[in-house]
């Protein structure tokens, strides 16, 4: 019997015994067996009738979250914050660069750690009854994860455009219009076959170790995926954890050369200054909400093809500071 079948049976039994009440209720089922993240991605991939989909694998902790469906949606940080505080239920979602956000209370959330796989089924019993027959029919479905070959990567910016952008940025920095810029270039990938966002995340997981991996799919046609080594925001009580990740050098096939590059990065004035700019920016934006900062010594965050200079940052938050306050400042 698969782990999904076991979870389905537990949730179905609880649903059949549920007394008619009003308000939010969350049913929980647990299997004392861990599963691979690829199985969770395959399960998400097979859920064609329940959206949105959300997948999030933590970087430093053995915990992965996969969700489908939405019982309730929120389009502002304020709304999401109020709901979480009043209900103690977990939301998933994110914030765009422009500040637009979307968070949802998922219909079904699976949480995996090193020992257990736990399912959380959320209902609002004050609303019209929902038929879960179809939902449970797909609960046990999984789709195999495939590998893809890239046929034609194409940069969105030519070398001359790249050079012109840098020169323009320097002019604006000298004039005081900007204090810093982050160099970035978009790459358009063309694949030999039709692709699946879920398979791309699995491929990235295998290559980009030591990263957060995530997926957000509004529907079957559109998905946002990524893998990032950098922590933006983690909170535990009145403690906030973030980090400055800036300054980069290559990782080569030669371990000795890679280590030499790392030592150069730790002592290079330009990269140290670049990293400190990020530290200063974080401190400046959070200063009104923080009682004390602790900036750790620089260290190396090594990935499969590059290594970065990183400073871990811890802060003690003032009383009554909300998540939304911090996120608005550092996002």
Language model features with spans:
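Contiguous alpha-helical scaffold segments within structured protein domains
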Residues: 2-36, 59-68, 126, 133-160, ...
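Residue-level signal for inorganic ion chemistry
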Residues: 176, 233, 280
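ATP-grasp fold ATP-binding core
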Residues: 56, 178-185, 214-217
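Short coil/turn connectors at secondary-structure junctions
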Residues: 50-51, 86-89, 115-116, 177-178, ...
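An anion-binding catalytic pocket shared by soluble metabolic enzymes
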Residues: 58-61, 65-73, 104, 108, ...
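Structural signal for hydrophobic packing residues in well-ordered secondary-structure cores
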Residues: 170-173, 177, 205-208, 286, ...
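A generic N-terminal leader/anchor concept
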Residues: 1-118
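Non-catalytic accessory segments adjacent to catalytic cores
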Residues: 75-189, 291
